[in-house]
C-alpha cells in the first residue's frame, strides 16, 4: 500500500565528472520491511545509503520521506526525521563505555549533551534512551564495559544500538556483518529479524545467504544502474542476476544435487 512507503527515491543520480556512481534510481522503501541492496563493489550501494542519510547530495533526482522532499535538507535534519545510519567500518568510541557510546548518539535526539553541566532531566532522558538501545541489541549486560574490550561482533551490535538510540523509524545499515564469523553473523541476523518488525531497514550486505534470509524486498545494482527489485525468489530467478552475481556457483550446486 502507498501509505506504507516511508522513504522513496525518484530518478536519483550521483555523478563525479564523467563517473556515474548512481544513475536514475527510483526505489520505494516500506515500513516494517527489510529491503536488501546488493551488487558488486562499485555498484553504488554505499553511495545510495550516503544520499538516503543526507551526507551526500544527489546530482539530480529527489528523495522523499513520508511524501515530503528531504534531499535538500542538512544531514542533522535527516536524523531528526528518524533516519539512522551505520557504516561499513566500525564507527564507535572505543575509549568509553557502551552506555556512553549510545548516550553520545542519543543526545542528537534530544538536542542536548550527556555531561555534568546538562540538566538532570536531560541526562536522565539520554541515559534511558541509551539503556533501552543497548537492551534492544542484547547488550544490557555490557552497559559499563569499555567498548574496546568487547568482541568485534559485539562492537557491531553496539553500532546498531547507537543508531537505535537516535529513535529512528528507518535504519540504513552498511554491511553490519562484514568481517564476522558464522556465529556472530547469526546473532546479527536474529537481531535484524526482530528489529524489522518495528522499523524500515535498508540493508547493504555482501553475505548473500544472510540477505536472502532477511529481505522482504531485494534490489540489485550494477555499475550504478538499477537491475531489478523484487522478492528474493524473483531476484534469484532473474537470468541477469544469475549471470552477473549468483552465476555458475548456484548452477553447479543445482547440478551436483540432481
Language model region names:
Residues 2-258:
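Glycine-rich phosphate-binding loops of nucleotide-dependent enzymes
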